[in-house]
């Protein structure tokens, strides 16, 4: 087994004495830093490499702190207006994961970079911490490499805002197999529209 395989096994056993201590110390360290800052290198190099990170020019890693818990509707003094069914303010659940929120914040902060992927690095009772891999689409090392040229195209601008990253796709219900029948045809809306449109073909 290579070194990364050993690291992967360490991270799989998060309840071991070593990992519990390490994660506690790291969470304390991350709390002292700002809620979004650049990490000098990936905390989990094995995970980062599996998600597409390379230790070369054009790749950067940002660490993001996201507050845990549900979402409160941003309305003044709870005045939502409208029917009582929509009066909810406090027990609202956000449609996307906290990981996709972290990707969005990193993408907003680094507008010129492209979000490739992200992964979990720790959590405590109040926060979750994620590291987001970003790529500079104008760097020659990225543009000249056939494996990474795809992300330099304009269609991949702010892919994290449009649910095109791995974390973003999960909340959209996209996938393969019997669990993902709700999104056959590209999206929930496309599937619903196709199933609820009466087609009276001319030659039937």
Swiss-Prot record:
GO cellular component: cytosolic large ribosomal subunit
Complex formation: Component of the large ribosomal subunit.
Gene symbol of the encoding locus: rpl15
Protein task: Component of the large ribosomal subunit. The ribosome is a large ribonucleoprotein complex responsible for the synthesis of proteins in the cell.
Organism whose genome encodes this protein: Siniperca knerii
MF term (GO), any: structural constituent of ribosome
Residue pairs linked by disulfide bridges in the UniProt entry: none
Top-level taxon of origin: Eukaryota
Family, similarity comment: Belongs to the eukaryotic ribosomal protein eL15 family.
A Pfam family the protein falls into: Ribosomal_L15e
NCBIfam families hit by this protein: PRK04243.1
InterPro entries (UniProt xref): Rbsml_eL15_core_dom_sf, Ribosomal_eL15, Ribosomal_eL15_CS, Ribosomal_uL23/eL15/eS24_sf
Localization (cell): Cytoplasm
Chief place of localization: cytoplasm
TM annotation in the entry: none
Keywords for the protein's UniProt record, in alphabetical order: Cytoplasm, Ribonucleoprotein, Ribosomal protein
Protein name, as recorded: Large ribosomal subunit protein eL15
